[in-house]
Swiss-Prot record:
This is Pheromone-processing carboxypeptidase KEX1. Belongs to the peptidase S10 family. Its main location: Golgi. Residues 646-655 have a biased composition (Acidic residues). Residues 595-687 are cytoplasmic.
Length: 687
């Protein structure tokens, strides 16, 4: 198998071998010839002369959210639009037609609370060529979509959800490289290598800080998933060594289920398959897999299938052995795509008259063949519809993009041929040695960029005079008393394995990833006076509290809405102090008043409960898709997520290209099967 990816799709591209791919794009643009490359040195940057103002980019409302800034429980300030990224003629990323007139699109959610200081996170999805709206609408952002069937307008609308990373940091979701999502690239202007992408990101940042100067100098983090495991280290290296943005306040990078080091991750497929029991020569499918896929309980994985997998790995290893220098090791290695194919092939079969296959992003699920995960996650059809509605396009200042939004643009992926690029893993030691912490996190149920491959990377990495985590042990990670994963840290590098989660961890367990990023950024919630309702988070002996995100009215505390505005904080603090003083005065008054009453009368007096702590199971109906159970209860998918979805060919006229836009179906029970339950994993997953 060959191709690139990040949110990872399974499709073939010529001349590369990767476990990754991208969704087909409906954008029809003529192929561009490879442009001549001039000097690779980056010279002084050409500054953009015409930029929009912050006011021009403000997004006051979206369908379903008429006035986000004054929302009663979750006020939100959103900015969105395009900014130039073309670094200038003759510069890296600007040779010939390459990158000419390119613009990168972004959506920024300002921080809702300020715990001591401001923080900014730039988020990237992978692909290459996959839009960061995956992140903002389905993972770590403040929004989820509401199906048209559930709205009074008959349109797909947006709703606000808790657990987003904008709770304590301003999050900027960037569509890049140019041409991705709402971003713009001229027909012959697509980028080809990572140094070009870095140059465009640096130029974008300079323009971004011109429009939002208050964010320049703020502690900054880069984060993303999948193929962003290639982008992010290159961007970090460029910022550390940038002449255009000297002393850049880069405080860390976070990569989820990233494609980083092919030499470690291709063998990781085989280790993952054996550990999960997906391939166990001569024995039935593992008990865990049988529980989720009862119809397959009688299938035997033969010795021959295991031998084919080992043979594929051997052929791959012969190719990998040709590369001994990480700075010449390519992102994808020929003949190695066969390794993952050999793992998934036995799970492609006829079932109830339909050909199905494993969902490579969540091995607990299956999907219609040949989608194998492309029909997932279940929100995707509504995301497509939402981002193609005229009202949304106008509100998000995306009208200048002539072609319709697509999740992943194949033209971007194809043109990014990486002929002059090496794997990003080569840069990790120098990033760590520059004092920039790195967090790698992995959903335990993802195959395509699985945790075994990530663990091989961190265990083989050498920096600071030592290899891997040395003597640092893996510690259990608990949220409200439930183990949600494991965490390991040494010399600036952290690795988090997250249970019950897929390739898109934030989609499955948003509150866990919220706790994770708060820990990584060292957010101190004790600096939020008046925040009464809290959750506990513990890694080993390190126990902390995190703000309980929920309905402030039901929580019985002060409103949990601060947005980082010091005037609002002062107002809330004053109100809180006034209320406490009033309650104390009332209690003292009642005490002296009732001392003069008969005891029998006093015994009937009790202070009325003003509210209740809202537990994780106290949810509004319909919220379960976005809310992670933090106790022992199970989280079931609602009827919408259980729906069959669209068939492969029923949306071609809308640009879906016959790929299908539904959910990878669980086979155990169409309506009653549990998607995941914290505390119910196999024991093997917890070590």
């Amino acid at each position: 198998m060959s191709g690139n990816d990040a949110r990872a799709r399974v499709r073939s591209l010529p001349s590369t071998s990767s476990p990754l791919e991208t969704r087909d794009s409906d954008e029809q643009e003529s192929s561009s010839s490879q442009s001549q490359r001039g000097s690779r040195k980056r010279g002084p940057q050409r500054r953009a002369t015409e930029l929009p103002s912050a006011a021009d980019l403000y997004v006051p409302s979206l369908p379903g959210l008429p006035d986000m800034a004054t929302h009663p429980t979750h006020p939100l300030n959103i900015y969105a639009g395009m900014l130039p990224s073309y670094p200038g003629e003759g510069k890296v990323g600007g040779e010939g037609e390459t990158g000419k007139d390119a613009k990168l699109y972004f959506l920024m959610a300002k921080a809702r609370r300020n715990a001591g200081k401001e923080r900014v996170i730039f988020w990237f999805n992978g692909g290459p060529g996959c839009s960061s709206f995956d992140g903002s609408l389905m993972e770590v952002g403040p929004f989820r979509t509401v199906p048209a069937s559930e709205t009074t307008t008959g349109m797909v609308e947006a709703k606000l959800v808790e657990g987003g990373w904008e709770e304590f940091a301003t999050v900027v979701f960037v569509d890049q490289p140019p041409g991705t999502g709402y971003s713009y690239a001229a027909t012959n202007g697509y980028l080809h290598d990572f140094d070009e992408l870095s140059a465009h990101f640096i130029e974008f940042l300079q323009n971004f800080y011109t429009v939002f100067p208050e964010l320049k100098g703020v502690d900054t983090y880069l984060a993303g998933e999948s193929f962003a495991g290639q982008y992010i280290p290159f961007f970090a290296d460029a910022l550390i060594n940038s002449a255009e943005l000297p002393n850049f306040p880069l405080k860390g990078i976070a990569i989820g289920n990233g494609w980083i080091d092919p030499k470690e991750q291709y063998p990781g497929y085989v280790e993952f398959a054996y550990e999960k029991g997906l391939i166990d020569s001569g024995t039935p499918v593992s008990a865990a897999f049988v529980d989720l896929h009862k119809e397959r309980a009688d299938q035997m994985l033969t010795d021959q299938e295991a031998e084919e997998m080992e043979a594929a790995l051997k052929r791959c290893q012969e190719e990998m052995d040709k590369y001994t220098d990480p700075f010449t090791t390519p992102v994808n290695i020929d003949h190695c795509g066969e390794v993952m194919d050999s793992v998934t092939r036995p799970f492609t079969q006829e079932l109830n008259g339909k050909k199905v296959c494993m969902n490579v992003y969540d091995v607990r699920l299956v999907d219609d063949f040949p989608a194998c995960g492309m029909n997932w996650p279940p929100d995707l059809p509504d995301v497509y519809t939402f981002l193609r509605q005229d009202e949304v396009i106008s509100a998000l200042h995306a009208s200048s993009k002539e072609t319709a939004w697509v999740e992943c643009n194949n033209k971007v992926s194809y043109e990014l041929n990486l002929k002059h690029s090496h794997m990003s893993a080569a840069l990790l030691p120098s990033i760590l040695e520059a004092g920039v912490p790195i967090l790698m996190f992995a959903g335990a149920e993802d195959l395509i960029c699985n945790y075994k491959g990530i663990e091989r990377i961190v265990n083989g990495l050498e920096w600071g005079g030592e290899k891997g985590f040395a003597n640092a042990t893996s510690q259990e990670w608990y949220l409200n008393g439930t183990q949600v994963g494991t965490w390991q840290t040494s010399r600036g590098l952290s690795y988090a394995k997250i249970f019950d989660s897929s390739h898109m961890v934030g989609f499955d367990v948003p509150h866990v990833t919220n706790d994770m990023i708060m820990r990584f950024m060292d957010v101190d919630v004790s600096l939020l006076p008046g925040m009464i309702s809290q959750w506990s988070s513990r890694i080993g002996d390190d126990e902390r509290t995190m703000i309980h995100v929920g309905d402030a009215g039901e929580a019985g505390g002060v409103p949990l809405i601060k947005g980082g505005n010091t005037d609002w904080e002062a107002w809330y603090n004053a109100v809180f102090a006034f209320l406490v003083l009033g309650i104390l005065v009332s209690i003292v008054g009642l005490y002296f008043y009732f001392r003069r009453k008969p005891v029998s009368y006093r015994s009937r007096i009790a202070l009325k409960q003003r509210g209740r702590h809202r537990q994780s199971h106290d949810r509004d109906e319909g919220d379960t898709a976005e809310r992670m159970p933090l106790g022992s209860e199970r989280l079931e998918l609602d009827d919408i997520e259980r729906a069959e979805g669209y068939e492969f060919d029923d949306r071609d006229d809308e640009g879906y290209s016959g790929k299908g836009k539904g959910k990878g179906k669980e086979l155990a029970d169409d309506r009653e099967e549990v998607m995941f339950a914290l505390g119910d994993d196999d024991e093997d997953d917890r070590h």
